[in-house]
């Protein structure tokens, strides 16, 4: 329902501005408490977002936009994917695409690192997977900032003692910051046994995404306790987007050892 409301609102924005043909994209901010939607940006042109949408769906937005601008209609153009349906058919996909922004605040020391609706990223990474965990972890690695997935991060003020109140306050303080690596602190909070409900109350993240991160952390814990000789577990880890390097870190062994075990069990990348 929320998606349909956005779709209809996007068309209304295009008509109001006067975009009759070509590529365009509209971006919204959504209040998670009441569903209120606000238009924060509209690009009446083929943009970087259009390029990512093309990669994600296989629909050649720039090419179609150019042909429309010279007088063709969508019904006259062939769908490049199916080869027999017109381009007016909206693309449907059976996989998950994740886009994550790339921030380099370390290069811009005078810039406020607090995130808002103002664009502060210098680029983004996109990944495709058969499920969210796989797509998400692949996207994190694609940022090329040294992550193997939901890597552990240190939390200032947290100690390994049983000072529960002090540790809770330290975790809560980091979660309250709207910062680029907030997702890693959320994962760390889950590792420290903070509930999804508590994290949602602090961050306002949708519980679905928090539950997906919870599943990744649960798999981490299962991997730490079990042997990699268990083929079903290793296969589950790979299907959930864990790289050989990430598994090696969990088991405190070399990446080469993980790769050898994986190949021994005939677990190899496949393409649909």
What role is predicted for each listed range?
Residues 1-233, 240-241, 265, 269:
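ATP-dependent carboxylate activation and anion-phosphoryl transfer catalytic cores
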């Amino acid at each position: 329902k929320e998606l349909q409301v956005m779709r209809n609102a996007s068309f209304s924005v295009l008509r109001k501005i006067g975009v009759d043909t070509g590529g365009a994209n509209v971006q919204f901010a959504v209040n998670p408490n009441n569903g209120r939607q606000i238009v924060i940006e509209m690009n009446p042109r083929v943009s970087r977002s259009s390029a990512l949408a093309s990669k994600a769906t296989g629909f050649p937005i720039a090419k179609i936009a150019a042909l429309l601008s010279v007088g063709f209609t969508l019904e006259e153009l062939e769908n490049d994917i199916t080869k027999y349906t017109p381009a007016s058919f909206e693309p449907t996909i059976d996989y998950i695409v994740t886009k994550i922004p790339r921030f380099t605040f370390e290069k811009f020391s005078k810039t406020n690192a607090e995130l808002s609706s103002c664009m502060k990223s210098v680029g983004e990474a996109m990944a495709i997977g058969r499920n969210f965990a796989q797509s998400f972890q692949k996207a994190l690695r694609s940022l090329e900032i040294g992550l193997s997935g939901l890597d552990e991060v240190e939390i200032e003020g947290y100690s390994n003692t049983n000072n529960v109140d002090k540790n809770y306050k330290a975790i809560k303080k980091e979660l309250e910051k709207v910062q680029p690596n907030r997702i890693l602190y959320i994962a760390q909070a889950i590792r420290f046994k903070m509930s999804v409900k508590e994290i949602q109350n602090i961050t306002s993240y949708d519980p679905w995404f928090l539950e997906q991160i919870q599943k990744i952390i649960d798999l981490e814990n299962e991997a730490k306790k079990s042997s990699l000789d268990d083929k079903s577990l290793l296969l589950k880890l790979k299907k959930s987007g864990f790289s050989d390097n990430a598994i090696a870190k969990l088991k405190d062994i070399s990446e080469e050892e993980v790769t050898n075990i994986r190949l021994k069990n005939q677990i190899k990348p496949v393409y649909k």
